[in-house]
From Swiss-Prot:
Signal peptide feature range: 1-20
Cofactor note (record): Binds 1 zinc ion per subunit.
Protein name per Swiss-Prot or TrEMBL: Coagulation factor X-activating enzyme heavy chain
Taxonomic lineage: Eukaryota, Metazoa, Chordata, Craniata, Vertebrata
GO molecular function: metal ion binding; metalloendopeptidase activity; toxin activity
Pfam families, sorted: ADAM_CR, Disintegrin, Pep_M12B_propep, Reprolysin
Record text on subunit structure and interactions: Heterotrimer; disulfide-linked. The heterotrimer consists of 1 heavy chain and 2 light chains (lectins): LC1 and LC2 (AC Q7T045 and AC Q696W1).
Chain sites annotated for binding Ca(2+) 1: E204, D286, C390, N393
PANTHER family named among the record's database cross-references: ADAM A DISINTEGRIN AND METALLOPROTEASE DOMAIN (PTHR11905), DISINTEGRIN AND METALLOPROTEINASE DOMAIN-CONTAINING PROTEIN 28 (PTHR11905:SF32)
Keywords: Blood coagulation cascade activating toxin, Calcium, Disulfide bond, Glycoprotein, Hemostasis impairing toxin, Hydrolase, Metal-binding, Metalloprotease, Protease, Secreted, Signal, Toxin, Zinc, Zymogen
Length: 612
């Protein structure tokens, strides 16, 4: 039996419904005024935790176009990690890192009742603010600033007055990959989604806020903006079974820590260098996005490295912020992350169930939240080809910050199991209604659970992927497989041709093969002398757009030179160089550069015993 608590919000007369009004998103030509009524449905035995300000699930009822709609909301428990932190800098350059309380946050995902294709991303911090999709149309909702009133404005995205400006586009250009495999039509995507679910992946994200944005907004407004944007990006990636978790935010309060210029390419290159040599050493994460107010050349609104996810210098992106148009900024960020995950710009034959798709090279006047059939195809290819380790391992239950939500198929602290909703659950060990184990069951989820029993101690639950990885074994006490580990950095591998680095064995031969094919090998030592020149092609690193030559002892940590043995193309000193992706083709961190030495994140050849 359910108890239904109906909170009726007093109505106020608002005389300007339907006319033009200036709202947070800009000048809106047509809108409705609504008064959401909150409907809280709790099980009879449920008790709301007194210290919890924001409920885990909520429902609101209001009218759109004269028809009642019920908005179901569920707190986005993936939004923050357990160790979420914020870093700021004082005028003298000292960094201060804090860990604000984020468990009881007010950011939700949702859906509209009786609309199977609906979705929503909502902030409930002060009224309802965000967007929802209803009957194929994208609507925005926000509170009206009227004293003692619960009035909200609801309007279609298309009714925001457009700025008179040149078309905005993505700065990624090397997106001409085509496959011989047939691309599924949009109508086929729904039919096959249940059969071909994407493997669940987890991206731990850091947002870096440049000095222009820090000066533009106060601290609270900047935080709210970032949370709303990441909440929406998280929602956009749900159909691909990707979960984004915010690990931290870094604010460049006093000055930019790189040279942010109107050249998007140079800024991206500098940001990648900084992330690989600085941020990655301080903060564990998978990807970093620079949030900037710089107006880039060529109407560029974002740029990133294709296939760059999990790579020290390439798992980054640049996103231009668009004032209070958080939905637009979120779509740009999702687009750039899509490139990091192997997605190319949509080609002519690419379609989705919308007028445009996320990976369009030019941002539509009505930005879409949908990936095309081509993007789905590209992402599958990326997972198969690159097998990006950093995003394939789920966070441990203790690392999830938000309270558990029964029925979301994520086994969280406080739950004995979670197999989804009662309608979808196929697990005989778990009671879907309560997330409790069925009588006689020892476990219901986890890699160390089999036929409702915990596997015996010593049973392998995660096999070693290669010689630098280690297998994980069940403890006999828990159904959860221990955290993924690997051999210590610096352990010899590949017959002493390399040293282990973060679970991989990076050697130059494999990197040459990746760039130029199976016939490629490492070039003669004389080729690497080019890296001492600090030339257009040969250098060790870049600082504020200037190419720094390698010191003599570091030449094998700069640009990689290979011997291409393919027929008709025997170049003794071949290297990979693209103006728009200068990190690709550099020797990877952790690579052996001499006996007993490896390349560190600063592209220096250092003793393996002191490198880590």
């Amino acid at each position: 039996m359910m108890q239904v608590l109906l909170v009726t919000i007093s109505l106020a007369v608002f005389p300007y419904q339907g006319s033009s009004i200036i709202l947070e998103s800009g000048n809106v030509n047509d809108y409705e005024v609504v008064y959401p009524q909150k409907i809280t449905a709790l099980p009879e035995e449920a008790v709301q935790q007194p210290e919890q300000k924001y409920e885990d699930t909520m429902q609101y009822e209001f009218e759109v176009n004269g028809e009642p709609v019920v908005l179901h909301l569920e707190k986005n428990k993936d939004l923050f990690s357990e160790d979420y932190s914020e870093t700021r800098y004082s005028p003298d350059g000292r960094e201060t890192t804090t860990k604000p309380p984020v468990q009881d946050h007010c950011y939700y995902h949702g859906r509209i009742q009786n609309d199977a294709y609906s979705s929503a991303s909502i902030s409930a911090c002060n009224g309802l603010k965000g967007h929802f999709k209803l009957q194929g149309e994208t609507y925005l909702i926000e509170p009206l600033k009227i004293p003692d009133s619960e009035a909200h404005a609801v309007y279609k995205y298309e009714n925001i007055e457009k700025e008179d400006e040149a078309p905005k586009m993505c700065g990624v250009t090397q997106t001409n990959w085509e496959s011989d495999e047939p691309i599924k039509k949009a109508s086929q995507l729904v039919a096959t989604s249940a059969k071909r679910k994407f493997h669940k992946t987890f991206i731990e994200l850091v947002i870096v806020v440049d000095h222009r944005v820090v000066k533009k907004y106060d601290s609270a407004a900047t935080n709210t903006k970032i949370y709303e944007i990441v909440n929406t990006v998280n929602e956009i990636f749900i159909p691909l079974n990707i979960r984004l978790t915010l690990i931290g935010v870094e604010f460049w309060c006093n000055r930019d820590l790189i040279n942010v210029t109107s050249s998007a390419d140079d800024t991206l290159d500098s940001f990648g260098e900084w992330r690989g040599s600085d941020l990655l050493n301080r903060k564990r994460h998978d990807n970093a996005q620079l949030f900037t107010d710089m107006k880039f050349d060529l109407s560029t609104l974002g740029i990133t490295f294709l296939d760059g996810m999990c790579q020290a210098y390439r798992s980054v992106g640049i996103v231009q912020e668009h004032g209070n148009k958080n939905f637009k900024t979120a779509v740009i960020m999702a687009h750039e992350l899509g490139h990091n995950l192997g997605m190319y710009h949509d080609r002519k034959n690419c379609i989705c169930n919308d007028s445009s798709c996320i990976m369009s090279a030019v941002l539509s006047s009505q930005p879409s939240k949908l990936f095309s059939n081509c993007s789905n195809h590209d992402y599958r290819r990326y997972l198969t080809t690159y097998k990006p380790k950093c995003i394939l391992n789920p966070p441990l239950r203790k690392d999830i910050a938000s309270p558990p939500i029964c029925g979301n198929e994520i086994w969280e602290e406080g739950e004995e199991c979670d197999c989804g909703s009662p309608k979808d659950c196929q697990n005989p060990c778990c009671d879907a209604a309560t997330c409790k184990l069925t009588p006689g069951a020892e476990c219901g989820n986890g890699l160390c659970c089999e036929k409702c029993k915990i596997k015996t101690a010593g049973t392998v639950c995660r096999r070693a992927r290669d010689e630098c990885d280690v297998p994980e074994h069940c403890t006999g006490q828990s159904a959860e497989c221990p955290a993924d580990g690997f051999h210590a950095n610096g352990q010899p591998c590949q017959n002493n041709n390399g040293y282990c680095y973060n679970g991989d064995c990076p050697i130059m031969t494999k990197q040459c093969i990746s760039l130029f094919g199976s016939r490629a090998t490492v070039a003669e030592d004389s080729c690497f002398q080019e890296n001492q020149k600090g030339s257009y092609y040969g250098y060790c690193r870049k600082e504020n757009g200037r190419k720094i030559p390698c010191a003599p002892q570091d030449i094998k940590c700069g640009r990689l030179y290979c011997l291409d043995n393919s027929p008709g193309n025997k170049n003794p000193c071949k290297m990979h160089y693209r103006c728009r992706d200068q990190h690709k083709g550099m020797v990877e961190p952790g690579t052996k550069c001499e006996d007993g030495k490896v390349c560190n994140n600063k592209r220096q050849c250092v003793d393996v015993n002191t490198a880590y």
